[in-house]
A protein has these predicted regions:
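Charged alpha-helical initiation segments
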Residues: 1-42
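Short linear sequence motifs
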Residues: 7-9, 13, 48, 73-76
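Amphipathic alpha-helices that form helix-helix packing interfaces
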Residues: 23-26, 48-55, 112-119
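Short, structured coil/loop segments at alpha-helix boundaries
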Residues: 33, 50, 99-103
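Short, hydrophobic, well-ordered secondary-structure elements
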Residues: 38-61
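Flexible secondary-structure boundary motifs
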Residues: 57-129
Length: 129
């Protein structure tokens, strides 16, 4: 009869890093196989946004652990509603002012947000030519 071994692990798992690895992997795959790379690029862009939001949660929890315990509730209402509110709150907690949203590289965040919203709340697109 085999001996049963039980292992326990303690620590932290950095989800934003795992999500970023997907971005890197999809980007590399797109470079290696340019034909059909649209889908690799699309996955990379979506995961880039998810990695950013996960990183905001990581930083926010470090800066304001009590607030982040009930993060979903806090960011469900004004003045810090949704992703927009979350990024503004993290910047505020870090003592930083928000950069202009129409200037790179910060404008890329909002481009990715639009893409995420478009795909997450996708509707049938009617094309009439």
């Amino acid at each position: 009869m085999a001996t049963r071994v039980v292992t326990s692990v303690e620590g932290e798992r950095f989800v934003h890093k795992e999500l970023w690895r997907v971005v890197l992997r999809q980007g590399e795959h797109a470079k290696q196989a340019p034909r059909g790379s649209f889908y690799d690029d699309l996955v990379a862009m979506m995961f880039c946004f998810h990695a950013l939001e996960a990183y905001l949660n990581y930083v926010g929890e470090k800066l304001a652990p009590d607030l982040w315990k009930d993060e979903r509730e806090y960011f469900s209402r004004q003045p810090y509603r949704g992703f927009d509110g979350k990024i503004r709150k993290v910047l505020e907690l870090a003592g930083l002012s928000e950069p202009p949203r129409n200037q790179r590289p910060y404008s890329s965040v909002w481009t990715l947000k639009k893409l995420r919203d478009l795909l997450a709340h996708g509707k049938v697109e009617v094309i009439d030519t």
